[in-house]
Amino acid sequence: AYKMEDVEKITKEAPFVSSGRKIKGKAKATCIGYRGFVDDGYTFGVGKWKNTGRLEMTMSHGYQVVPWFYVGLGVGIHYWTDEDMDFGNIPLFADFRADFLESSVTPFLDLKIGYAFGLNDNGKGFYCNPSVGVRFAVSSSYGINVGLGYEVQMCKIYYSSYFGDYYGWKVENLGGISLKVGMDF
């Protein structure tokens, strides 16, 4: 037991959840430790490839190094929806993310960079998706993310047009504007 004159200040500490993260409130920023993401989205083709949109699903698992910086590894599946391009790929990537505020609503920057493996001969090549967005904390452990970015997807494409002057394989950027919605945990 302490004597009252020895006590300078009485404070209440935040309780710990099972993962070792402190709960700072009902819906606050992320804490240091394991963190995972699952995103669904669509990329709208641009330029020469404006009709080559694709459905996407990605997930990333890693470590929140400090409250504002995350690093992880991820995998996804992309499927092109154009009638002339029936193929998909599986990107494997490193994921780097910065959350700017320690609050329940925070802007973020995200960079996914890696290589996509084609589900057939088309669709394999360098993959990069920088994006900006907003995270809405739902609880101390979960958040909803909305992001907008530009996706670079280098692909080896086979040209077989009878009316064109080129036949064979060519590497093209099937890049586009990506819109993603997902959750983190």
Please provide the spans of the model-predicted regions.
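A short local loop/turn or secondary-structure capping micro-motif enriched for an aromatic residue
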Residues: K9-I10, W80-T81, Q153-M154
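Compositionally biased alpha-helical segments
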Residues: A1-F37, G41-G47, N51
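Short edge beta-strand segments in beta-sheet-rich domains
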Residues: Y2, P91, E172-G176
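Predominantly the C-terminal beta-signal and adjacent terminal strand-loop region
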Residues: T106, G125-F185
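Intrinsically disordered, low-complexity segments enriched in small/polar residues
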Residues: S18, I23, C31-Y34, D39, ...
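Gram-negative (and chloroplast) outer-membrane scaffold detector with strong preference
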Residues: I32-V46, N51, L55-I144, G182
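Short, flexible, glycine/charge-rich loop motifs used to bind or transfer phosphoryl groups or to couple energy/partner
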Residues: A27, S60, G168
